[in-house]
A protein has these predicted regions:
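Sec-dependent signal peptide recognition
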Residues: 1-7
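Histidine-centered active-site/metal-ligand motif
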Residues: 2, 178, 217
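N-terminal signal peptide c-region/cleavage motif recognized by signal peptidases
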Residues: 14-15
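Hydrophobic alpha-helical bundle signature of multipass membrane enzymes
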Residues: 23-213
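Interfacial helix-loop-helix junctions of multi-pass membrane proteins
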Residues: 206-237, 244
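C-terminal membrane module of polytopic membrane proteins
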Residues: 232-263
């Protein structure tokens, strides 16, 4: 899963264009593709520096039979009622952070059309910060090696990778990388566009919640994914290069034409 998530993050900052085709429930006009490829993606802000020591910050996943483990399994069982429903469909549309549906929903939360064509400084900041989350996420996943719920408690999941016996490609469950990156970006973009902080944080929380609806994560995976995102955010806040990029993103978003989406 870390390879899949990394590819999506890099695509956000280095693709020639990020389409803005929203899902039917969130119509957003399409962005015009850039005519030429964008410059090479810079590395993360922590490149060449020790990554976040996530094992000192993240609690171990619930012990089998504990109250949290029971709650996780109950939530997974209950989520079967949502198969095929609105959250299930939204989770499918937003399987990748670089997907058009994900970017359209994030744009609506920020109140500006996000793409390399329209907000390049913001997109590079978002992508670089996402790269910095991959290393600690991978360390935690490999250390705890928690199975995905659909591999232990069975049942359908919304990610097609979970089918046809290739579910192992999704990797381990704990913590949720999608939840972590969604919350990291929510914290960063709340600083870059403070007038939209409430909507942005709602989107960030929803990124993790959709992974439960997708039935690829336990509740505690998602909760502690947010802890991962917050830990990376706190570390980045001390980096001068990140602060400089944040200043550029603030100015860029303040000058961007407002984007109003249906409520």
């Amino acid at each position: 899963m870390h390879a899949i998530l990394l590819a999506a993050v890099v695509a956000m900052g280095s693709s020639g264009a990020i389409a803005q085709q929203a899902p039917a429930s969130t119509p957003v006009p399409a962005a015009t593709p850039m005519a030429t490829p964008s410059p090479a993606m810079p590395p993360g802000y922590l490149n060449g520096k020790p990554p976040v020591d996530i094992l000192k910050l993240l609690p171990a996943p619930p012990v089998p039979g504990s109250a949290q483990d029971v709650a996780d399994r109950a939530a997974y069982a209950a989520s079967a009622k949502g198969i095929g429903g609105p959250d299930w469909q939204a989770a499918i549309a937003q399987l990748s952070p670089s997907s058009p549906a994900f970017m359209a929903a994030l744009s609506c939360a920020v109140g500006a059309r996000l793409s390399l064509a329209t907000t390049p400084a913001t997109m590079v900041m978002v992508a670089r910060s996402g790269i910095d989350l991959i290393a600690p996420m991978t360390v935690a996943k490999e250390h705890y090696a928690r199975p995905r719920p659909f591999t232990t408690d069975k049942g359908e999941a919304c990610d097609p990778i979970s089918k046809d016996g290739v579910g192992a490609r999704l990797g381990y469950a704990y913590p949720s990388g999608h939840s972590g990156i969604g919350w990291l970006w929510a914290l960063i973009l709340s600083d870059a566009a403070p007038a939209h902080a409430e909507a942005i944080r709602r989107f960030g929380q929803g990124t993790g919640d959709l992974r439960v609806a997708c039935r690829v994560h336990w509740l505690s995976d998602v909760a502690n994914g947010r802890l991962l995102g917050a830990a990376v955010y706190q570390r980045l806040a001390a980096e001068p290069e990140y602060q400089a990029d944040l200043g550029r993103a603030k100015a860029e978003l303040a000058a961007a034409p407002p984007l109003v989406c249906p409520g």
